[in-house]
């Protein structure tokens, strides 16, 4: 068990105890990257998004990922049905707030999904600011520079702590320069990663997929979140040290998903701490 300074004691989640089946309801842009990321860490993805299939798959899956990057009336209905069924069967669920910063409809959907007590709700700084009812200058699906300024980050951490206290069954994660975790009454931060991870699409989606995979493998929500975020960011750090160009960097980051776990000491490189009560 690794006792990180200022962070909860967590165990190395790799190798997985079994190959959890993760149902992913996601967008067409990053669906392949997410499926492969789950496979690279020895999970099993199923990209089932049709309501008439849910009853069968809910009997099989170990975790559910709801990514708001795909959006239409049919998708909204499917996300709500899947969320409700997963809650009834106590299947751990991750909700990814893709596009919430720029869309009132997605924000309304996210608030409805919160009512079904997902294990994790995640988004970038701008998405999480909107979800916490803070002003944001985010556009589209990307976080804005203003939302990543020190004062704005501190404001977000405080708002997330308030939200987590109101919804103690859910962990809230904001990804950015510092990844912020709010759970129950505590706020933590993680500091691994490189700027290049913001330069190819799907990095946040992959983190959501990794969190869901670890939850499906029976890991508690703090272990799953800290491990998934830090593991992916450390994969990026390794990739940057050996590649030139963003295409090669992307490929090597994905390669490292299956390789970094071979280093039994990888968790020694996790950087972060606890912010405490703000």
Walk through the language-model features, giving the residues of each.
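Acidic-glycine-rich active-site phosphate/pyrophosphate-binding loop
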Residues: 3-15, 171-192, 264
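Conserved post-catalytic alpha-helical subdomain immediately downstream of the catalytic base
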Residues: 201, 209-252
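Charged C-terminal helix
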Residues: 233-278
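General beta-strand structural signal in soluble alpha/beta enzymes
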Residues: 24, 46-48, 93-97, 121-125, ...
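Conserved phosphate/ATP/ADP-binding segment of small-molecule kinases
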Residues: 105-187
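Short pre-catalytic strand/loop immediately N-terminal to key active-site residues, enriched for Gly-Thr
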Residues: 190-201
